[in-house]
Amino acid sequence: MLMFKFFFLLFSFLFSFNSYSYWQQRVEYKISIDFDHKNHQFLGEQNLKYFNNSKDTINKVYFHLYFNAFQPGSMMDVRSRSLPDPDRRVMDRISKLSKNEIGFHQIKKIEQDGKSLIHHTQGTVLEVELAYPLMPNQSTDFYLEYLSQVPVQIRRSGRNSKEGIDYSMAQWFPKIAEYDENGWHANPYIAREFYAPWGDFDVSISINKDYIVAATGILESKKKVNNKNIWNFKAKDVHDFVWAADPDYVHDILKVDSENLELHFYYQKTNDEMVSNWKRLQDDTADAFRYINKKFGKYPYTKYSVIQGGDGGMEYPMATLITGERSYPSLLSVTVHEVLHSWYQMLLGTNESYLAWMDEGFTSFAQNITFNNEFNDIYKLDSKNPLEGSYNRYYNFIKTGLEEPLSTHSDHFSTNQAYGVGSYTKGAIFLMQLGYIIGEEKLYSGLRRYYNEWKFKHPDEYDFLRIMEKETDIELDWYMDYWVKTTHQIDYSLEVFEKDKSTVSININRIGK
């Protein structure tokens, strides 16, 4: 009887441990597109092997069709026109797009292991009913054919940017949604955040021979076929793929041997000042990588590309798209910010729809620390408090009464300002104040431990918190509960009363919640 109880308890423990063990889905993409630059359209063939590493049986899957957001009446369009403080890059521009300016994905065929599938498209989401269930620890193969049109560049992706870049190709293919312990995350696209499974990409782009192509991954081959070149890129262990193309790109390469890294820079020769800035940027980017590798953890890939394109600055695996016609401090600032996103979101793949503060906030914190230590001759931050500007922005925003909890879904903030100040500014202060609580040395050792234990995974806020608690042996749930889940502030006043010449009475009053 005693032996039976022992084995029963052992089995119960193992079952319980297995029930809560970490898992994540995985994908393998093989995409080939034939690009028609005259009509801004491309035909795509996409093979996708999908690995179900969950304990669940899957009967349907979802894909994101991001280009469909750039159509009059889309959710992105309506939301932009409804916000009290719309993004100036978007405003009502989508509502004014003509038929040949909109974006779209038209799914021509989708199969599962050779069997045609029933599918439905609603806005930016494609719902696909499987021919047969996908069981736990099994994989299946999808095949898609589609026609896509590249929209006029409004937000992140598109053609003919304001700086004259022909194609900024972000969120350009039907991308399978993430499935995790909370189920599917097939959120409609309204220009905010992304979340996708880890995997490998093999992408072939057939485009007019005059174009220079920059992309995620390593260029495996470039073959001329008739009047086109076929560019083949491969990337391992990433959760997205970006590319850009322009006939006038200058392509510079800087080898950083100490970091086992090649830095690639793609930009236009718009004017002498711009060329000078982009040349200067190259050594500074190398210095940034050297510092960040030591401070926050080693970058694991052998390539990173800084690409002129898009509408501001946006991070992708092994690359960023940035606008390039900037003053040098602005150019370096946006580059360092996007480089740091390689740590916070590209390698620590949080669900930024729910945890934008762990993406933008952690990046903004690390950006200021990097500036203070490497580039303070340019930015002149307060060395004792490199985030002084963040504290001032947050304090001024609190007074507006518009603050919302950081735990708000990024698509559901009532204003763009609440999202921006919360995610970027309050998120950065989260780490600064955490350092005050646990000590600066423990903060940075904890950040490196967090990176080393959770890179190539999908951590959440509690995974981060547990790392910091292990590193410090301090309970920190209270800090998360108040700083992230509420808008309570630390606010005290002092009242000083002189009772007589030798006695002073001081009252400390708590004003904040």
Q: Model-predicted segments: where are they?
A:
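Asparagine-centered strand-capping/turn motif at beta-strand->loop junctions
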Residues: Y50-S54, I508-K513
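Acidic/His/Gly-enriched intrinsically disordered linker/tail segments
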Residues: Y354, E360-I429, Q433, I437
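Zinc-dependent metallopeptidase catalytic helix centered on the HExxH motif
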Residues: L321-L387, L447
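Ligand-binding face of N-terminal immunoglobulin V-set domains in extracellular IgSF glycoproteins
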Residues: L43-A69, S74, D85-R89
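Hydrophobic helix-coil surface modules that form long, contiguous segments used
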Residues: I176-G183, A191-V336, F365
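Extended, low-hydrophobicity, Ser/Thr/Pro/Gly-biased non-transmembrane segments
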Residues: D85-Q112, H119-H120, D141-D248
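N-terminal, polar/Ser/Thr-rich
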Residues: F15-L43, E163, L476-W478, I490
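Amphipathic alpha-helical substructures
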Residues: I378, G420-I506
